[in-house]
Design a protein with these regions (language model features):
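Intrinsically disordered, low-complexity regulatory regions of eukaryotic regulatory proteins
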Residues: 10-12, 354
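Short, Lys/Arg-enriched N-terminal segments with co-localized hydrophobic residues
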Residues: 12-32
Length: 365
């Protein structure tokens, strides 16, 4: 990525380094940290120190878009300091942040510019541009419009837990998480990561919890749920702020609909939405979690990071246990713990083939 052009100079240009805990004034920073988590397991053959990672990421620091550049991404200090480190190590957890900038050019504006360029061509040559030439005119229109386009920025938090060899990306979509993971693996040679899989299907477990009315140990079922039928039309039933321990929910599941989202609370401290793809969304730290934490500016970042990751790490561990335990691809599944939720016999195969699919999606040999 080349140096930025056509943007405010000096300190104003560095305001992209939003704090890792960007937050509204009414909330403590840590309370809005990590709204979503996609979980990965780090490859066994990769290791690095904080200093080595920081040095590697420095070669891919964020630089804002140039005049005709549509998109830019790079690493920024998670603390929000203009010239701070790119890796923060707190309580054994490593925090990073990727900044993504995208120039926004509305499609209608592009079309209007293409039409204007096409009219010029027709006037000069006496013929209308063909399909191939219109594509070239579209590229030209974008180059003309990009210097005037508004730039949107999104900061994506990354959490490395080296002792557990886990990686978590705060992304609301798999595509954004893939983009972050690609940037991370490009910056850190030898790093590999694969999505965390569990021995039991999240959908099957959520269905069992709803039908039985029994949440797994340490969790409670909240008031939001989405049920979807697997047939071609994929009819969907959604419950929002609604009691879920009702016959109607159980009837939908018995009729074949599968839970794709379910709101849960862990230990009365962290609420979240679990998806059938093992994504953790809409994370919220509940009252009392940050009570007593330092409010001093110099200490707040460390305190909030330690508390937030200290809550989420055991919550993730309990969640994976509730789903039958983590299943490392290529290894035989461990026996489900005694406290694992019951399930229908067809929902989990007796053995899991060594494939690149999650255990619940693998086709038996």
């Amino acid at each position: 990525m080349g140096p930025g052009q056509g943007q405010p100079a000096g300190g104003q240009a560095d305001r992209h380094n939003r704090a890792f805990f960007a937050h509204p004034r009414a909330q403590r920073p840590g309370q809005t940290m990590f709204k979503n988590l996609l979980l990965y397991r780090l490859g066994a053959d990769w290791s690095a120190t904080v200093a080595q990672i920081d040095e590697a990421l420095s070669a891919a620091r964020f630089t804002e878009c140039g005049l005709t550049q549509a998109r830019a991404l790079g690493w920024v200090p998670p603390r929000g300091d203009d010239h701070g480190p790119l890796v923060e190590a707190i309580a054994g957890q490593w925090l990073l942040q990727l900044m993504v900038e995208q120039k926004v050019v509305p499609g209608a504006v592009v079309k209007r510019q293409v039409d204007a360029l096409a009219a010029q061509v027709e006037k000069q040559t006496g013929r209308k541009p063909g399909k191939k030439q219109r594509k070239e005119l579209k590229d030209q229109a974008l180059l003309d419009l990009l210097p005037m386009a508004f730039a949107k920025r999104a900061a994506v938090k990354v959490w490395l837990a080296p002792a557990e060899r886990k990686l978590a990306i705060d992304a609301s979509s798999a595509s954004r998480a893939d983009e972050v993971l690609t940037a991370l693996t490009q910056a850190l040679p030898g790093l590999s990561a694969s999505l965390v899989n569990t021995a039991l299907s999240p959908a099957a477990c959520m269905a069992e919890w709803l039908v039985s009315g029994d949440a797994p140990a340490g969790f409670s079922i909240d008031r939001d749920c989405e049920l979807k039928a697997p047939d071609g039309e994929k009819p969907v039933v959604r419950y929002a702020r609604h009691a879920l321990d009702i016959a109607e929910v159980r009837e939908h599941i018995v009729a074949g609909k599968q839970p794709t989202r379910l709101a849960l609370t862990w230990q009365g401290r962290v609420s979240f939405l679990l998806t059938d793809g093992l994504q953790v969304k809409k994370i919220a730290f509940l009252d009392g979690v940050f009570d007593g934490a330092s409010t001093q500016k110099d200490e707040r970042f460390e305190a909030d990071a330690a508390i937030a990751t200290g809550e989420l790490a055991p919550m993730i561990g309990d969640l994976l246990d509730a789903l039958g335990g983590e299943q490392v691809l290529g290894e035989a599944p461990a026996a489900a713990p005694a406290a694992a939720p019951p399930q229908n016999p067809a929902s989990a195969p007796a053995s899991t083939p060594a494939t690149d699919l999650p255990p619940w999606e693998a086709t038996p040999a």
